[in-house]
From Swiss-Prot:
Reactions accelerated catalytically: DNA(n) + a 2'-deoxyribonucleoside 5'-triphosphate = DNA(n+1) + diphosphate
Gene: dpo
EC number: 2.7.7.7
Lineage: Viruses, Varidnaviria, Bamfordvirae, Nucleocytoviricota, Megaviricetes
Family the UniProt entry places it in: Belongs to the DNA polymerase type-B family.
Protein name: DNA polymerase
Length: 1045
């Protein structure tokens, strides 16, 4: 009898990755153990994973070599390859020459241009690290500097080696993503490693339970779908404000400069603003003069005498800004710092959590004009031709240059809430306070029941370092908050710089003693991570601490990016999402209390606040949004008790409750922080309330499951989805699918001035109140994906394009031609072809000073090959996606476990979003697979189908007598009342054969049947998979028409 060998494995669900060039941990030689004249760094991938017990592992991979492809001549031999690689090594120099570890000739398809499935010749070239990888890439680019602006562009005709034009392929895809594609593992999925294929680290270097080194080849996908308990930390800070306005971490003299200019502008006789008056107003800031309109300044240097101020002012008056050579730096600094100082008029970061772009994000500001005349500061102020912004800028910079440095506003409170994913409530809460903090008798039981730990610190430094200490102690996998990437992280970092504890404060990684900073390549200064995101409301710069082993989720960014809300204030968002309907009430007038009964109490705790909405034809805030404190929660009766006797009218309205922030105003926060220990508890509880709100929001919208499913579908890590734009996920997905089809993606240079193309069509609405005639809606199921599939629109099916002007003159064409100027791949046997026509546009000015206007300048015809078997890359990807979504929805219908049902739902939504985004990315100039002709052809097909749907319905149901399923005969005269992108809205104007109108409910019954019939009729003449169908919510649509048109 033979016994099977049991192979032991370890399994982890991956969630974060730390990628860098460094010295081998396996060799353990350290920096000094290598030849300093050679590039000895390796490409290192640190993977973080969680097991079912909630323990974290650090898995180091050192043997994956970054690579890309270079398209070369189809006749190249091994000799040509060796000579070309030697040429590249020569370009790299002696230091990097050994960093190319492998190269070989391969045959692959290329993504762009139809070529009858031809295989082309490429060199696959691999490097030890990304430093050498990127250095070799520079050969294919040309650098320029125009007016001080650095620009790097792809060589238009490739890199010319001898007589061969060489082109880069697959070089813009992060090497980490290629590892996922090759090993077929998911960055948020389960992996397994054989225990005999791993090496345990000799010396502990992380805060993880386990530390391993292994080969990437030993990472295998685990057939597992267990739920893991991510540890989640939600934090929020409160800051002081010396002037009672928006907190500023590092202060200059802008407030004093603003006060002085406001005084000057209000003067009737401005000649009285002389040297004496100017000096008096500056000294008033230091308390030596009485000027009611001048705010006090708080210098770091204490007890500055009047004599010292006199000496400073004397030098200050001699200062001529135009002669100051360092003012260029000031101008640059101004662009970065204005986003903070411009918040002076905001009530508070908390009141404006995401509500205003200026408060929520560091938005780019226009450059202030510098003052170039030879004049001192007083003369600049007195110059009536000088702009106010310039005066303010020059005065602020001059005061900051000569007068003592000012104290910034301090971090006074940090709240932290910790919850394990899938648990029903947080397990620990912290309030870190600068100063004493005493719990009032009323809240002592609340503190015990919610495991609230209050930590008192005497200094701001102590507050910041305690935050780091708790982060290490609790060791969360996910760190969240509201607008933390726009305010909290940046404020804390700048305060740590100001008080000299930056390195200790930023040891927030899962790697022991790792300081979470990077060097800014422009300034050479150490900074926290910065990122730029583009949303519908504009372009924003974000700052956050990149913590290896911890995922940052800013819920303010999530809601701005993925939801359309009337407000993005935390108070509104909490009330909108964390809410439910009121079933009944018991009013206790004697004790001035009301018990509220509701099915769902998620997110509510004793001591938090709720507000109510009255819902009828519209939604109104009950008592103008008044907030009520919760005194008690009874889970057995599904009810909570509020601190007021409220007669909610459940007969007249549908009443909803919504979670609200603590009822503490901004000014109260600033004032209470400087009062008694009990007063400070009020602020601390408020701060902790915001932490709890964010935790419940994260759970309610289930952003974790949503992003995990998208991560696994597109093979991109969670932090890519949360911190980068939308393009990277589709780039990864398309690259993976191309790889499966032996196809490579080139690096493409985008033409930013190629005009654009026409989007979706909208029919002019026939406005009216449709009360008696039901309006039906028939739309196309997945219009753009279906159009790409049905017409085989793809980069690799495009045969040629011909562009004409408005006079039908051919002005340009593309496509491979032979010596006789014939298109090589046109009219091939076994292929059919589809031509798509669309208008071309340019942005033109009618006059030199007029605004640019999008103008039709001609048209373009694109020819796409229709394959005898299968589809081109993009349609094939879409077919896979639509098929996967259908299968997932089928599984969801069979699943009984609500948690798994939710996972399937998030999965099918991720597939839907990816499928619908593919067309858009084809037309996005920032896309890695930009192809305007495919996107423009897709919208052209969409417009054609929209008109087709309208024409079929209006044509086939025009004065036609139809017998319905119940035998009733009706006369139809279909009329389109509106149409948009993929939908046609129409009414049948039903009558009996005798000419009597059929209206209201009976008309609705007939309209539903006729609309379904019309959709089926139109679908018969369409290519698969295009379907024209009735919307399922036709009844709801009718009520919307009645209420809103």
């Amino acid at each position: 009898m033979t016994t099977k060998t049991v192979i032991k494995t370890k399994s982890y669900k991956l969630y974060d990755f730390n990628v860098y060039d460094g010295f081998s941990k396996a060799e353990n030689l350290g920096k000094n153990g290598y030849d300093k004249f050679k590039d000895n760094k390796k490409f290192i991938i640190q993977m973080f994973g969680i097991n079912t017990a909630g323990q974290t592992a650090s898995i180091i991979v050192e043997d994956f070599n970054p690579f890309y492809y270079i398209k070369v001549g189809d006749d190249w031999t091994e000799s040509d390859r060796c000579e070309f690689v030697s040429h590249i090594k020569g370009k790299l120099g002696v230091y990097y020459e050994d960093s190319i570890v492998a190269s070989k000739l391969v045959k692959r398809h290329k993504l762009y241009g139809f070529d009858d499935n031809k295989l082309h010749t490429f060199i696959k070239i691999s490097f030890t690290n990304t430093g050498a990888y990127n250095r070799a890439k520079k050969m294919f680019y040309i650098d320029s500097n125009v007016d001080g602006v650095f620009k790097r562009e792809l060589l238009p005709d490739g890199y010319l080696y001898e007589e061969t034009k060489c082109y880069l392929y697959e070089a813009n895809i992060p090497p980490l993503l290629k590892l996922f594609h090759i090993q077929e593992i998911s960055p948020s999925g389960w992996v397994q490693i054989q225990t005999d294929k791993i090496t345990k680290m000799r010396q502990k270097s992380t805060h993880c339970a386990y530390e391993y080194i292994t080969s990437y080849k030993h990472l295998k996908k685990a057939d597992k779908d267990d739920i893991v308990k991510y540890s989640i930390c939600s934090f929020d800070i409160e800051a002081s404000s010396s002037h009672g306005d928006f907190p500023v971490p590092i202060k200059d003299y802008k407030k004093l400069a603003t006060n002085i200019l406001e005084y000057y502008n209000e003067m009737e006789d401005k000649t009285k603003f002389d040297v004496t008056c100017f000096k008096k107003h500056i000294n008033a800031g230091y308390g030596y003069e009485r000027c009611p309109d001048i705010a006090t300044v708080y210098p770091k240097l204490k007890n500055i005498s009047n004599e010292q101020l006199d000496n400073i002012f004397s030098n200050f008056m001699l200062y001529i800004p135009a002669k100051d050579q360092s003012r260029k730096d000031y101008i640059k600094e101004n662009e970065e710092s204005d986003s903070e100082s411009d918040n002076d008029d905001e009530e508070d970061k908390k009141e404006n959590d995401g509500a205003d772009e200026a408060a929520a994000f560091h938005k780019r500001h226009k450059k202030v004009k510098k003052y170039n005349k030879t004049a001192n500061i007083l003369q600049i102020i007195q110059d009536d031709k000088c702009e106010h912004d310039t005066k303010l800028f020059e005065l602020n910079k001059a005061l900051t240059k000569f007068y003592p440095e000012l104290e910034g506003d301090m971090v006074t409170f940090i709240g932290m809430t910790f919850l394990n994913y899938s648990d029903k409530k947080p397990h620990t809460r912290y309030i870190i306070v600068k100063g004493g903090c005493e719990v009032p008798e009323k809240y002592k039981s609340w503190v015990l029941e919610n495991n609230v730990k209050i930590i008192e610190k005497t200094t701001e430094k102590g507050v910041l370092l305690e935050f780091t200490k708790i982060m290490t102690l609790e060791n969360p996998h996910i760190v969240t908050g509201y607008n933390i990437n726009g305010f909290d992280f940046d404020f804390m970092f700048k305060r740590s710089k100001e008080i000299g504890c930056t390195e200790d404060f930023l040891k927030l990684s899962k790697n022991i003693d790792e300081v979470c900073m990077t060097k800014d390549w422009k300034t050479g200064e150490m900074e926290i991570a910065k990122n730029k995101i583009v949303l519908a409301s504009g372009e924003y710069n974000l700052s956050f601490v990149n913590m290896p082993g911890r995922i940052i989720v800013d819920m303010c960014v999530v809601f701005r990016r993925e939801y359309t809300l009337s407000s993005n204030k935390l108070d509104y968002v909490s009330s909108y999402f964390i809410s439910d309907s009121v079933k009944k009430i018991d009013v206790d007038k004697e004790n001035n209390q009301t018990r509220i009964y509701s099915k769902n109490l998620t997110g509510l705790t004793v001591g938090c606040y709720v507000k109510f909405d009255e819902v009828s034809h519209s939604t109104n805030n009950y008592k103008k949004g008044q907030k009520f404190e919760i005194l008690d929660i009874n889970l057995d009766t599904a009810s909570f008790l509020i601190d007021s006797a409220e007669e909610l009218d459940l007969k007249k309205y549908k009443i909803n409750w919504g979670l609200a922030k603590d009822d503490v105003s901004v000014q109260e926060i600033f004032e209470l922080a400087n009062k008694s220990d009990i007063d400070r508890f009020t602020v601390g509880k408020y701060c902790l309330g915001d932490c709890d709100n964010v935790i419940w929001l994260l759970i309610k919208v289930d952003i974790i499951t949503d992003k995990v499913e998208m991560s696994n579908l597109c093979d991109v890590p969670l932090n890519f989805l949360l911190q980068r734009g939308q393009g990277i996920k589709l780039q990864s997905y398309v690259s993976k699918k191309c790889g499966e089809k032996n196809t490579l993606m080139p690096i493409v240079e985008k033409n930013l001035n190629d005009g654009g193309y026409e989007g979706a069509h909208v029919f002019n609405p026939k406005t009216g109140l449709y009360l008696e005639d039901p309006v039906a809606c028939v739309d196309y199921s997945s219009l753009y994906p279906s159009s790409m599939i049905s017409e085989n629109l793809s980069h690799d099916s495009k045969v040629w394009t011909k562009e004409y002007d408005l006079s039908n003159n051919l002005i340009h064409s593309t496509g491979e031609k032979d010596a006789d100027e014939n298109f090589i791949y046109d009219n091939l046997p076994n292929y059919t072809y589809v031509d798509v026509k669309y208008d071309t546009y340019e942005y033109l000015r009618k006059t030199p000073k007029a605004a640019e206007k999008k103008t039709v300048v001609g048209y373009k015809i694109c020819r796409f090959a229709q394959f005898p078997k299968g589809k081109a890359i993009m349609p094939a990807i879409l077919e896979d996606l639509l098929s996967a979504r259908k299968a997932t929805k089928k599984l969801m219908g069979k699943e009984e476990d609500p948690f798994k049902q939710n996972i399937y739902d998030k999965r099918q939504l991720s597939i839907k979003v990816t499928a619908n985004s593919l067309y858009g990315q084809c037309g996005a100039r920032t896309s890695a697979f930009y192809e305007k002709d495919v996107a423009a052809s897709c919208t052209a097909i969409g417009r054609k189908l929209l008109f087709y749907g309208k024409d079929v319905i209006e044509g086939c149901y025009n004065n036609v007598e139809i017998t319905l399923s119940d035998g009733v005969k009706v006369v139809t005269k279909a009329e389109c009342v509106y149409g948009d992108t993929d939908s046609v809205f129409f009414k049948f104007n039903l009558k009996t054969p005798e000419g009597k109108r059929i209206i209201n409910k009976q008309a609705l019954i007939y309209t539903i049947e006729l609309a379904k019939q019309a959709g089926e009729l139109a679908t018969k003449f369409l290519k698969k998979p295009t379907r024209f169908r009735v919307r399922e919510n036709i009844l709801a649509f009718q009520s919307i028409i009645q209420e809103k048109i």
